[in-house]
């Protein structure tokens, strides 16, 4: 099991949480982005830079992810692809995308895209908060504890 990070849009504070977890639990964390990323020196942390372009980083994650891997992303279509490959997508606000909820997320995303394309100002997501960071860290810890107990 390893952790993949859709790093172009992942908040730095979430990356910091992942960096600490990588060293503490000796789990591989790989960031994928279309820009150069700075990572702390660690044999458990690496970054993959892909060419710029629409969904290039997402496609690389889908290509590399294995069943049982954790993928950190807020990108709903990427989360759907990860689920298809048996991965576990977790967004930076601490919500897992699952086979039970992914269709609802895809439908809402499509609806909001339609509103925006018709000129409606839908605003954006709420500001990232300390509560979001705690929710993410708690879900991450629970997930990793379950993985360790499986052996």
UniProtKB/Swiss-Prot annotation:
PANTHER family (alphabetical): UPF0178 PROTEIN YAII
UniProt record similarity statement: Belongs to the UPF0178 family.
Protein known as: UPF0178 protein mma_0312
Signal peptide segment: none
Any Pfam family: DUF188
């Amino acid at each position: 099991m390893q952790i993949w990070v859709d790093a172009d849009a992942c908040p730095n504070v979430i990356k910091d949480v992942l960096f600490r977890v990588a060293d503490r639990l000796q789990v591989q964390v790989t960031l994928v982005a279309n820009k150069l990323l700075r990572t702390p020196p660690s044999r458990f942390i690496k970054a993959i830079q892909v060419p710029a372009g629409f969904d290039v980083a997402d496609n690389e994650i889908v290509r590399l992810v294995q069943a049982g891997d954790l993928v950190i992303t807020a990108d709903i279509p990427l989360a759907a692809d990860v689920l298809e490959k048996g991965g576990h997508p977790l967004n930076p606000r601490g919500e897992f995308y699952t086979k039970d909820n992914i269709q609802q997320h895809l439908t809402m995303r499509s609806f909001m895209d339609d509103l925006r394309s018709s000129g409606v100002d839908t605003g954006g997501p709420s500001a990232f908060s300390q509560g979001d960071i705690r929710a993410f860290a708690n879900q991450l810890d629970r997930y990793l504890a379950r993985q360790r107990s499986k052996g």
